[in-house]
Amino acid sequence: MAPPAAALTPTVFFFCRLGDMVMVTRMLNLLHQRYGRPCQVIGTGSWTPTTYAGNPDVAGVWAFHRHLPFLLDAAWRPVRRALRDSAPGPVYVCERHFRQLPRIRRMLRLSGTDPRRCVFLSERPVRGPVRETDHLVDRLLALGARMPANLRSAEYPVPGTAALDGPRLYVLESERAERDAWLREQGYSGRELILVQPGNHRTMGPRRARWRRLNTDDKWWPIERWAQLLQRMHQAHPDAVLLLRGSKEELPLLREIQAATGLKSVGTVGTTLRQLYALCEAASSMVSVDSGPGHAAAALSVPLVVLYGAESPLYWLPRSPSGSPVLSAGGAPVSRRADQVSVDTVFSAWRSVAGYKRP
């Protein structure tokens, strides 16, 4: 009988926004099961390491600045060391962006990583939009099922789909305690909590005023429609707290929507991502534009409605690890802008998920 294969540490490169980094957690679970050790994750953005806090499929996380030359980045030396120390473990590159994929290839070359360890989602960098054929989670799982040239498939079989978990995020006990204390301070403790996420990466960015003035954000839904939706949600669940959530940069937008509702049951909060995850764990449902926080909510099993702009939910709809409902409103090919989606459509979708009882 052949001895069991030695456990290996997989390394995953993915230089993407929050939603993608949430969806990759199912692939991380596959790789952990397949190779016997949790993964090293290399991404971009200061928020990336905190996103994987408490995740048993992740051993370490490093994040580069997106536009700083990586040789000048503090993350470079520990990443180079981690790549060398994890040999002959596999390296999975989920990136295909025309700037980021060549950057990762340079990192691998300068770290001395054996090319036979590496498996790429795309051999060539991609510029501009791509016509997708499969959901991102499925594309990532297909990547994780591939075997690098330096290893043998028979020694590291791919776990069955039924054994996989995720996409999933985790909340720490200290974060639950902080959340519960905040809910008590606000007078929300013991009441149903419904989250609403009106913003996306454009509404929190430095050019947010310009996006709004020129009306060029395909994910923008007019203030009056958010107000009408919240009023109808309040009529359906009069005792619930309707909490408008965003980053601190989005608080003026949230307060504008709050004022337009004229409802005392509508609150606003600017949170960090970790605070958002804790709130999601306590929420009964959520309505979100197509954004990273929506993916986070689904990964924490929140019944969810996602309002789409130009993207297609066929390829980007958030997925839940528990089977909690996730419905889309709008998106290609039905519509190309969120403002083409009616309040009736979003409210009807929310009514469909709001009755789901979380375990």
Model regions: which residues?
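Catalytic machinery of carbohydrate-active enzymes
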Residues: 1-359
